Amino acid sequence: VGQIAKIKGCRAVGVAGGPEKCAYVVNELGFDACIDHRADDFEAQLATACPDGIDIYFENVAGRVLEAVIPLFNFWARMPVCGLIAQYSMTDLPTGTNKLPALMRAVLTYRLHIEGFIVRDFADMQADFRRDMGQWVRDGQVKYKEHRVAGLENAPATLMGLLKGENFGKVVIEVSDDPTG
């Protein structure tokens, strides 16, 4: 998403888990900055990286990252919600302070636009997306990294590793030999 934002002329700040991943996001993917969400001073680093606030936040994580983003929203900011990975492995509701009132206050104060983002809602745009994305990948404007794991039997452990941030790239489970190469 950040690479597309850069193509469209936006400033892009990424969030990743660890210095190696952050370096990749900046040096290989071309983001303007990337903040390690595991850093003790993550919130301060994010605020420094976004001195003019945040206009669009593509939500995939929730948890600490979302909490750090909320006070940085600009008026009329947009937040498409595509995932909440920090909550996927939760078996109970979080304890402690309820963060919903802070989010609702931000929605009101900053006139935020929050909308669920489900890919099938944009099926009518699929041909355009495939054309554009294919060209961007061929031109090297969009890059990707795969974290390949052989064998379907390794899928459960790989999923648990994904939830812990142990992967580096898009997880691909190889269930048979690659016929292309």
Where are these regions (language model features)?
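Terminal helix/beta-alpha structural elements that buttress the NAD(P)+-binding lobe
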Residues: 1-181
